[in-house]
Amino acid sequence: MKRKQTDTDLIHACMYDMLCLLGCGVNGTIPPKALLEKYRTENRTCGEEPEAAQERQLYLYRVSQAHFVDALTGTVLKQAGVSLFPDWAQSIAKAVRKEILFDAERTKLFSFMEQNGIWYLPLKGIILKEYYPAVGMRQMSDQDILFDETYAQDVKQYMVSRGYKVESYGENHHDVYEKNPVYNFELHRSLYTSSHKQVWAAYYKNIKEKLLLQDRVSYGQQMADEDFYIFMVSHAYKHYDGQGTGIRTLLDFYVYLQAKTELDFSYIETECRKLEIEAFEKDSRVLCKKVFGENAVNTIGSLGDEERNMLSYYLGSGVYGSRQQMVTG
């Protein structure tokens, strides 16, 4: 007798479908017909009732949402002709709107900093989103910016004048400002402090000396491609070694490595060794290509035991590192 599919089975299947959809989304490929049919609620070609597809679609949405990639997986399904239930379709529209609003607000903040001689460095998702295929595909909850802490009070006054609520100021290595409907800015005075790994705090203490001036501005800074990647790895490991980090982190690695094909890995490996993250960098670099590469349908099936464990850990963590059950009622 055929075993009845349990919720755990369904979640597990949806997780691997999510990986396939993410790979298709960033590689610009079409998902397999069999996968699409599982989530198609209209014009179905199999004899299964549409309610089964609706249930699967809901689970896939919840799994994707837990990893903050629901806009990307939903967009891939939608572009392939799969009708999405209203909440999912709305989440895609919200992700696009949020990125547009963040971009406009960030431009105003940078203009203020330029006018007042304050150097600044956009971090993490602000940079990474540019390597995703379309607006809204790389979802973000906040904006991370490193800036000259000498001007922290001036920046605070500016943010308050713009209607922001000061959630945190001078209490940590970053100040936090929030404003409706979606704005959340984390303005970093430093990248790491002694509360993190001592070697990280020491390595990044004088980071300004390694920064490069952006084109067409006077105070906007950027990291060299290799240094940005190294910081990506350290930030990812901070969460990975703590409460966990979701699959979006592994996807970020893949997207960045696909965009930057001429990175100096001799330098990267040397610096990662200093930061005690060399093994994590290598393992994540290899794994992301096996999971999201265009031959992933074959390479996922041939993962070694340690690679499977690492992938399971990524999949078992929400984007902010919760190791609790992701899919709830």
Describe each PLM feature range.
Residues K2-S141, F147-G329:
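Conserved NTP-donor binding/palm subdomain of two-metal-ion nucleotidyltransferases/polymerases, i.e.
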